[in-house]
C-alpha cells in the first residue's frame, strides 16, 4: 500500500488539486484476483491461497479505513456518537455469542444509517458488521454465518459486483487517448495511477516480503518459487472496482474523473495480463 501511494505522490506532489488522489492505487480488487487465480487452482497451494486472500483483504480493509479518515468532508458528532453506541451493541451481541442473524441485520441497518448521517462513508459499515458476526460459538462453527455467506454470495457475485463495475467504469472510449488541454494538465494523474498499480504494488509486496524470507523471519508458501510469488505480486496491481470507487469520491469534476477511470482500467489490465503471463509460465514448468 505504501509504495503505490508514494509513486502516485512522486508524479503529483506539485499539483494540489491532484495529490489528494494518492489512495487510488493502494487498493486490490479481491474478487477479480481470486477469479483469475481460480483458473490456476491446481497450481496454487493452500498456504499461497491464504497469503493472497490475506493481503488482498488487508489492502481493502485499510483502503476503507483511509476512505473514512481522509475522505470524509464533514463530521456530524451526534450521529458519530450514535454509531459508537451501535458498534458497542454489536460487541455485546458477539460477546454473548448471539447467532441469530436477524439481530445483526437490524443493528447493522441502524449502524449504516447513523454512519451515513455522521459523514463517514457507509462502506465501512459492512466491514465493521463482519468483524462482529461470530464464526465460532462454543468451539463449534456458526452455521448461521455459513448460511449468510451462501445467501449473499450469488447476489454479490452476479448482481452487486457487475453493477458496481458498470456504474463506476462509465467512461467514453475517447478518454483512453490522453490528449487536449484537459488531459495535458492531469497527465501526471494518469501516470501516477498506472505506475502506482502496476509497478508500485509488485514492488511493495516484493520489497516487504523478500527481507523477511531472507532473514528467516518467515518462509515462502509451500510449493511456491520466487517467480510464482512475483506473479502474485503483479496481480496485486488489479485495483479496479475499489480504486474506481475511491477515485469517484476523490474527483468530482468530469475531466480528472474520466482520466482517472481510464488510468485505473489500464493499470489493472496491464497488471492482470502481465501477472497471468508470468503465472502461466511458472505453471507450464511444473
Swiss-Prot record:
InterPro entries: Na/H_antiporter_dom_sf (IPR023171), NhaA (IPR004670)
Molecular function GO terms recorded: sodium:proton antiporter activity
Cellular localisation: Cell inner membrane
One Pfam assignment: Na_H_antiport_1
Transmembrane segments: 21-41, 50-70, 75-95, 101-121, 122-142, 158-178, 186-206, 229-249, 262-282
GO CC annotations on file: plasma membrane
Keywords linked to the UniProt accession: Cell inner membrane, Cell membrane, Membrane, Transmembrane, Transmembrane helix
Principal subcellular localization: membrane
Domain of life of the organism encoding this protein: Bacteria
Membrane topology, from the record: Multi-pass membrane protein
UniProt similarity note: Belongs to the NhaA Na(+)/H(+) (TC 2.A.33) antiporter family.
Protein name (record): Putative Na(+)/H(+) antiporter NhaA homolog
Organism of this sequence: Rickettsia felis (strain ATCC VR-1525 / URRWXCal2)
Amino acid at each position: 500500500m505504501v509504495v503505490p501511494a508514494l509513486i502516485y505522490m512522486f508524479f503529483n506532489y506539485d499539483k494540489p488539486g491532484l495529490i489528494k488522489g494518492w489512495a487510488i492505487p493502494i487498493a486490490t480488487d479481491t474478487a477479480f484476483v481470486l477469479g483469475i487465480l481460480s483458473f490456476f487452482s491446481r497450481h496454487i497451494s493452500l498456504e499461497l491461497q491464504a497469503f493472497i486472500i490475506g493481503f488482498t483483504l488487508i489492502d481493502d480493509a485499510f483502503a476503507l479505513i483511509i476512505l473514512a479518515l481522509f475522505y470524509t468532508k464533514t463530521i456530524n458528532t451526534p450521529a458519530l456518537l450514535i454509531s459508537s453506541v451501535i458498534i458497542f451493541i454489536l460487541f455485546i451481541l458477539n460477546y454473548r455469542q448471539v447467532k441469530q442473524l436477524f439481530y445483526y441485520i437490524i443493528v447493522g441497518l441502524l449502524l449504516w444509517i447513523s454512519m451515513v448521517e455522521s459523514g463517514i462513508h457507509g462502506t465501512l459499515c459492512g466491514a465493521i458488521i463482519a468483524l462482529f458476526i461470530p464464526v465460532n460459538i462454543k468451539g463449534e462453527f456458526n452455521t448461521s454465518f455459513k448460511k449468510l455467506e451462501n445467501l449473499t454470495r450469488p447476489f454479490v457475485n452476479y448482481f452487486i459486483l457487475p453493477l458496481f463495475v458498470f456504474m463506476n467504469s462509465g467512461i467514453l472510449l475517447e478518454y483512453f487517448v490522453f490528449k487536449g488541454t484537459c488531459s495535458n494538465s492531469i497527465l501526471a494523474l494518469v501516470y501516477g495511477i498506472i505506475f502506482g498499480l502496476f509497478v508500485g504494488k509488485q514492488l511493495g509486496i516484493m520489497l516487504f516480503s523478500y527481507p523477511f524470507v531472507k532473514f528467516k523471519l518467515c518462509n515462502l508458501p509451500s510449493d511456491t518459487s520466487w517467480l510464482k510469488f512475483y506473479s502474485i505480486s503483479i496481480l496485486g496491481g488489479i485495483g479496479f472496482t475499489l480504486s474506481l470507487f475511491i477515485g469517484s469520491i476523490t474527483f468530482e469534476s468530469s475531466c480528472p474523473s474520466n482520466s482517472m477511470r481510464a488510468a485505473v482500467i489500464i493499470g489493472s489490465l496491464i497488471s492482470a495480463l502481465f501477472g497471468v503471463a508470468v503465472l502461466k509460465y511458472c505453471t507450464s514448468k511444473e
